[in-house]
Structures are given as structure tokens and as C-alpha cells.
């Protein structure tokens, strides 16, 4: 497994498993919303009213709508950072 995917795969899998609604921002600024239905090395299948295949190279940011559990230790640390960031935002 490539080093870059050691965080990506558990993160996306937890989003899929827990059916967490996400906002996906593309590099061109477009915002897509839905749930991660499936993913592989190159694409994410995003389901809303329709299913869309989104190429990962076109994605800038994936933003979960709520906290969720990630089983991978590295991913858990990233989730803690996500929670801390949103706690700061909520206080403003």
C-alpha cells in the first residue's frame, strides 16, 4: 500500500461505512454533496439523488458533515484535528 493511502482509505471507508454526508470540493471550486457509496485508487462514487463518479485528481477537499469514527490510528489523529478545528469554528 502506498504511504499516501494509509490515511485516505480508512478515512473514506469510515465515511462509507457510517454513511456520513460529505461535501466534496473540486479543484475548480465546484461543491458536490452526498454520501460515499464506494471508492478505489482513482475515483469516489458519490451518491445523492444520483450517483456520480468523481475522479480523485479533481478533488481538493472532503468535508464530513459530522464527526465519525476512523479505526486506523493515523486516521484517528486526523479526526482529532478535524474535531479541534470545528470546535474552534463553533466558538466564533
Curated annotation (Swiss-Prot):
Extract one GO cellular component term from the record. cytosol
List keywords of the entry alphabetically. Answer: RNA-binding, Stress response
Query: Which InterPro entries does the entry mention?
Result: Hfq, LSM_dom_sf, Sm
Database matches in SUPFAM superfamilies: Sm-like ribonucleoproteins (SSF50182)
Q: Does the keyword Lyase apply?
A: no
Instruction: State a single Gene Ontology molecular function.
Output: RNA binding
What are the BP-aspect GO terms?
regulation of DNA-templated transcription; regulation of RNA stability; regulation of translation, ncRNA-mediated
Q: Which residues form the Sm domain?
A: 9-68
One Pfam family, please name it: Hfq
Q: Which Gene3D superfamilies match?
A: 2.30.30.100
| Family stated for the protein in its record | Belongs to the Hfq family.
Q: Which HAMAP family match?
A: Hfq
Q: What does this protein do?
A: RNA chaperone that binds small regulatory RNA (sRNAs) and mRNAs to facilitate mRNA translational regulation in response to envelope stress, environmental stress and changes in metabolite concentrations. Also binds with high specificity to tRNAs.
Assembly state and interactors? Homohexamer.
Name of protein:
RNA-binding protein Hfq
Amino acid at each position: 500500500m502506498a504511504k499516501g493511502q494509509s490515511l485516505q482509505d480508512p478515512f473514506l471507508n469510515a465515511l462509507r461505512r457510517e454513511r456520513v454526508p460529505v461535501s466534496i470540493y473540486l479543484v475548480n471550486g465546484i461543491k458536490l454533496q452526498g454520501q460515499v457509496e464506494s471508492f478505489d485508487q482513482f475515483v469516489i462514487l458519490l451518491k445523492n439523488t444520483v450517483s456520480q463518479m468523481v475522479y480523485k485528481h479533481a478533488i481538493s477537499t472532503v468535508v464530513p458533515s459530522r464527526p465519525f469514527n476512523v479505526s486506523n490510528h493515523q486516521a484517528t489523529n486526523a479526526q482529532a484535528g478535524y474535531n479541534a478545528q470545528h470546535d474552534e469554528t463553533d466558538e466564533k
